[in-house]
UniProtKB/Swiss-Prot annotation:
Basic and acidic residues: bias regions: 53-67, 743-760, 813-822
Function per UniProt: Non-neuronal microtubule-associated protein. Promotes microtubule assembly.
Underlying gene: Map4
Residues found modified as Phosphoserine: 5, 60, 99, 254, 257, 417, 509, 515, 520, 522, 599, 618, 668, 685, 695, 761, 799, 801, 827, 902, 915, 978, 1050, 1056
Region (Disordered): 49-98, 246-276, 327-347, 382-404, 503-555, 569-927, 977-1057
Compartments in which it is found: Cytoplasm, Cytoskeleton; Cytoplasm, Cytoskeleton, Microtubule organizing center
Entry annotated with the keyword Acetylation: yes
PTM comment, free text: Phosphorylation on Ser-761 negatively regulates MAP4 activity to promote microtubule assembly. Phosphorylated at serine residues in K-X-G-S motifs by MAP/microtubule affinity-regulating kinase (MARK1 or MARK2), causing detachment from microtubules, and their disassembly.
Swiss-Prot/TrEMBL Tau/MAP repeat ranges: 897-927, 928-958, 959-990
Main location: cytoplasm
Gene Ontology biological process terms from the UniProt entry: cell division; cilium disassembly; establishment of spindle orientation; microtubule cytoskeleton organization; microtubule polymerization; microtubule sliding; mitotic spindle organization; negative regulation of non-motile cilium assembly
Official protein name in the record: Microtubule-associated protein 4
Lineage: Eukaryota, Metazoa, Chordata, Craniata, Vertebrata
Residues bearing the modification N-acetylalanine: A2
Length: 1057
């Protein structure tokens, strides 16, 4: 170790040395370099390339002492470059401060490199050393830094540094409050150590730095980032998760303790400096808009390219979708597409490397603002962007903290960022819109992502609530911005049905879309950030969620955003004088979200929609949508229905039909319009909605969303059509509508009642689709939704929707909410399976008529079909979501699936049957039977009593055969000492086989194993003819599909056995 010199480090590939060093450090460095190096600066210097010995030995001392120095170093651009330029030697002179400083400087360099924020020189300088470090191994420290940084970031160097560093880290932890470091693997420690060296973490810092860097808008720095990110991404993905967990936690403690100089004396200042830099950078609106926009475009393009490489099709799709929507927008938002694309790539990048993901993500966030800056008001937004970057930086920090601190920290950070954002929103509505919407999007995303991360429902639920509450506040603040709505709309569009949604949205209003897109990157970025924060794994979901937004995000972001989008779309549509369609769509949309928004007058809603929806509707609707998200069915129902409905507005029939699940998403805009249209009712319902969120669990008949929105008609027609359709589904769907209808019944006219019914119907189908993604985040959203709903004033219509989700349980039969749910899932599913097509067609048809027919006529006509079909769709959707696990039809599906899967199994069984030994070895379902049959030759008679019995068992049922199979399996697998033992297994085995359900097919095969005649039957077993030897098997042969699935089950069982 000590023998290694800077020259050696430079000469030899640092990674190899690091690899060796890792081993050495693991064993020796912890003891030797730690103590000796602390005393001897020379060894430290030598170890500096190793980073562990150097930085640890020096940093344990220095970091405590130099923590301030680190911040100072960060503050002093020259010192960092000097350190870099000096390399380890220059630092050696100042060993204690130098080494730590050096280490810190390297981190700072990396940080600056990423953060080039207020130090463009340092950034570029650092950037040169950084990139050059790879090429230039002149500075072993730098080289190590790059390699170690990337590796550290980090695979090869990370653990090595971690080893020595961990011991060092104990003091470091003391000084840095990085206690988690110990608990975290050396990798985490080293990563954080890097972070600490770089004031606590390049990761935590990078969160700021990416954003800052972007704001600094130094393409070179961005390029270096991209390069590092690329390498890091490669290394990071495997290690990213562990690193992320450790680093994030480590970084989080540092960040959390960042506030305390003790823990992160240097990191705090560094972060503060970074933030200050960001603020300063942001302070220069012109610089920001120019630098940010250009760098974003360039660096983001690079990142986007790299990230897109990762994202690939997704990014391309998003780009294409964005581009499609962007035709008009592209001019205003040339940089926005890269930003948005970058956002998606950022997400992808985020997945591989969360810490660094923060960089791209935050960069994405910054670019959206920056992009928005040019579009909105570069100067205005620039300062706002400065503020937002701070808040975003905090958000980034919060996100970094989030993994360790958990979503609450992120929420707190988000809250702070929101507060800051809100301030800008007060001063700058545009920024607020963008920022607020991103925050909201982030909130929902966080909720969704959180929900996904944890149990998607557990963590998301608890955490989502605060976030969404915050979101509620933001929404209240945000209600004014239409751009927010547009943003939400755009975001939703991307996530939901990228092409379809974009097309629909674009038709609605490209201007809106343009603004939306500009704003949209922020939410998307936030989404990426949130996704990143939550976890690499979660990030993947997040990607899916974010671009698709249907599975997970749709609940929150999609619904909330969709609501905004739909609202905006509705506004635009109305502006486009699509009032008629909108009215019909509104009817449909309102049907989709029956409780959501049934205003006394659809037309009125359409008219007011553009006015009020912006103020109340968008935020309130968002809240309600979130609330809906909280309620599983209604949430997505609302979101989906809204989007779909919005699509319907664009192409009422075509879009709705095209996207049956999303079909009802657009109702949210229309709902919004209507609740807003019924401003008084909306307000009333707002108060009610507020109450309703509180009573969300009981929202069955609270008439929370103002009696206006829901009507008995809605209830009656919704429940009656649905009820006949399918009692459970009808109960749930109808119950929701009925509850809301009861509320809305009061003020609404009959026409609106129809609309309500209609809305209710879409709402239910929507809720069903929502269930898929909804279940994860639904609980979380529910909690958060309540606060959000409370906050939202115009959430009346949405509140009902939100309420609806829970109402399904407490619907018509409040006494049997659970039963309703279950029944809805099962019988409703079964009924829905039948009415599935009908409901889809009906919904589509209804949607089409809605678009064509005025609210009143269409409402009544459509309401009935929609109510029943929609509900069926809802139940159906629910069924589908469980993967048709609930509906009886789903059972057939399962069997079919099993059959499809089992077919290969049968083949494999046959091939394996080739040898008795193989068959015995393969206890799998049918194979087991074959084995058993072979066993049967020797044992079957005792076990089954006789081959005839075996045949009879299949006749008796798959279970019987299964039991036999299991028994045989036991024999074949364990070759139970005695037939009695085998016989005993069947009791348990039978139960197991029951799950297999159709192991009889294997029995045919096993008989084949037993005797030539049976073997013949066995091959036939695949075909119905296998009955030749086994009558029972013949029957099974008839149900060959079942056999195969059963066989699979059997095989699985045996494997477990």
């Amino acid at each position: 170790m000590a023998d290694l010199s800077l020259v050696d480090a430079l000469t030899e590939p640092p990674p190899e040395i690091e690899g060796e060093i890792k081993r050495d450090f693991m064993a020796a460095l912890e003891a030797e370099p730690y103590d000796d190096i602390v005393g001897e600066t020379v060894e430290k210097t030598e170890f500096i390339p190793l980073l562990d010995g150097d930085e640890k030995s020096g940093n344990s001392e220095s970091k405590r002492k130099p923590c301030v120095d680190t911040s100072q170093v960060e503050d002093i651009p020259s010192s960092k470059p000097t350190l870099l330029a000096n390399g380890d030697h220059g630092v050696e002179g100042n060993n204690t401060t130098g080494s730590p400083t050096d280490f810190l400087v390297e981190n700072v360099d990396y940080e600056d490199y990423q953060n080039s924020q207020s130090w463009p020189e340092d950034a570029s300088f650092c950037f040169q050393p950084q990139q050059v470090l790879d090429t230039n191994q002149a500075d072993p420290f730098n080289v190590h830094h790059d390699d170690g940084l990337a590796d550290l970031l980090f695979v090869s160097s990370g653990p090595t540094n971690a080893s020595a560093f961990i011991e060092e880290n104990n003091p470091l932890e003391d000084s840095y409050g990085v206690l988690p470091c110990d608990s975290f693997a050396p990798t985490a420690v080293v990563s954080q150590e890097w972070s600490v060296g770089a004031p606590d973490s390049p990761h935590s810092e990078p969160c700021v730095s990416p954003e800052v860097t972007i704001e600094t808008a130094q393409p070179a720095t961005e390029l270096s980032k991209a390069v590092d990110l690329e390498s890091v991404k490669e290394q990071l993905p495997a290690k990213a998760l562990e690193m992320m967990a450790g680093q994030t936690t480590d970084a989080v403690p540092s960040k959390e303790s960042e506030g305390s100089p003790d823990t992160d004396a240097a990191p705090g200042p560094d972060t503060d400096v970074t933030l200050t830099k960001d603020i300063e950078e942001s302070s220069s609106p012109d610089v920001i808009s120019a630098n940010v926009t250009q760098p974003f475009t360039e660096s983001d393009m690079f990142l986007t390219q790299e990230m897109e490489l990762l994202i690939g099709t997704e990014a391309a799709q998003v780009k294409d979708t964005m581009s499609s929507v962007e035709p008009d927008i592209s001019s205003a938002k040339n940089t926005a597409p890269p930003t948005e694309e970058e956002t998606v790539p950022g997400k992808d990048m985020t997945f591989p490397k969360e810490a660094e993901t923060a960089l791209p993500i935050e960069m994405d966030l910054a670019p959206p603002e920056d992009v928005a800056l040019p579009k909105e008001t570069e100067l205005e937004l620039a300062p706002a962007a400065g503020t937002a970057p701070l808040s975003e930086t905090e958000v980034a920090l919060a996100k970094d903290e989030e993994p360790s601190t958990g979503i609450p920290a992120a929420q707190e950070m988000l809250l702070s960022s929101e507060t800051e954002v809100v301030l800008p929103s007060d001063s700058i509505m545009t920024l607020t819109k963008e920022v607020t919407v991103p925050l909201e999007a982030a909130g929902p995303l966080v909720s969704d992502m959180t929900a996904i991360l944890e149990t998607e429902m557990t963590l998301g639920g608890g955490t989502a609530t605060p976030t969404e509450t915050k979101l509620g506040k933001v929404k209240d603040m945000a209600p004014l911005p239409e751009s927010e709505v547009a943003l939400g709309k755009d975001v939703v569009t991307l996530p939901e049905t990228k092409v379809t949604e974009f097309n629909n949205v674009t038709p609605l209003s490209e201007e809106e879309v343009a603004s939306i897109k500009d704003v949209s990157p922020s939410p998307e970025t936030e989404t990426a950030k949130n996704a990143d924060l939550h976890s690499g794994t979660e990030l993947t979901l997040d990607n899916s969620m974010t671009p698709p937004s249907d599975p997970a995000l749709p609940l929150e972001t999609k619904v909330a955003t969709v609501q905004i989008k739909d609202k905006e779309t509705v506004q635009t549509q109305e502006e486009l004088s699509e009032d008629s369609q909108l009215e019909s769509v509104q009817l449909e949309g309102q049907s989709a979200v029956p409780p959501c928004t049934i205003s006394p007058e659809p037309v009125k809603a359409a008219d007011q929609k553009s006015t009020l929806p912006v103020d109340e509707g968008s935020p309130l609707e968002k809240l309600e949508q979130k609330e809906t998200s909280g309620s599983q069915p209604p949430e997505l129902c609302s979101g989906v229905s809204r989007q779909e409905e919005g699509k319907a507005a664009v192409g009422l029939t075509g879009n709705d039909i095209a996207t049956p699940p999303n079909k009802e998403l657009p109702p949210s805009p229309e709902k919004k319009a209507k609740p807003l249209a019924t401003t008084q009712p909306a307000k009333t319902s707002t108060s009610k909605a507020k109450i309703q969120p509180t009573s969300l669990p009981k929202q069955p008949a609270p008439t929370t969303s103002g009696g206006l929105n829901k009507k008995p008609m809605s209830l009656a027609s919704g429940s009656v059509p649905a009820a006949p359709h399918k009692r459970p589904a009808a109960a749930t769907a109808t119950a929701r509508p009925s509850t809301l209808p009861a509320r809305d019944l009061k003020p609404k006219p009959i026409t609106e009642t129809k609309v309500a019914e209609k809305r209710t119907s879409p709402s239910k189908p929507s809720s069903a689709p929502a269930l898929r993604p909804g279940p994860k985040t639904t609980p979380t959203i529910s909690k958060a939704t309540s606060p959000s709903t409370l906050v939202s004033t115009g959430s009346s219509s949405r509140s009902p929707s939100t309420t609806l989700p829970k109402r399904p349980t407490t619907t018509k039969t409040e006494g049997k909410p659970a039963d309703v749910k279950r029944m809805t899932a099962k019988s409703a599913t079964a009924d829905l399976s039948r009415s599935k097509t009908t409901s889809a067609s009906s919904v589509k048809r209804n949607t089409t008529p809605t678009g064509a027919t005025p609210p009143a006529g269409m409402a009544s006509t459509r309401v009935k079909p929609m109510s029943a079909p929609c509900r069926s769709s809802v139940a159906l959707s629910v069924d589908k979501k469980p993967t048709s696990t609930k509906p009886s039809s789903s059972a057939p599906r399962v069997s079919r699936l099993a059959t499809t899967v089992s077919a290969p199994d049968l083949k494999s069984v046959r091939s394996k049957v080739g040898s008795t030994e193989n068959m015995k070895h393969q206890p799998g379902g049918g194979r087991v039977q074959i084995q058993n049959k072979k066993v049967d030759i020797s044992k079957v008679s005792s076990k089954c009593g006789s081959k005839a019995n075996i045949k009879h068992k299949p006749g008796g049922g798959d279970v019987k055969i299964e039991s036999q199979k299991l028994n045989f399996k036991e024999k074949a697998q364990a070759k139970v000492g005695s037939l009695d033992n085998v016989g005993h297994l069947p009791a348990g085995g039978t139960v197991k086989t029951e799950g297999g359900g159709s192991e009889a097919p294997p029995c045919p095969g096993p008989p084949a194993g037993e005797e030539p005649a049976i073997p013949e039957a066995a091959p036939d077993a695949g075909a119905p003819t296998s009955a030749s030897g086994l009558s029972g098997h013949t029957t099974l042969s008839g149900g060959g599909d079942q056999r195969e699935p059963q066989t699979l089950d059997s095989q699985i069982q045996e494997t477990s056995i």
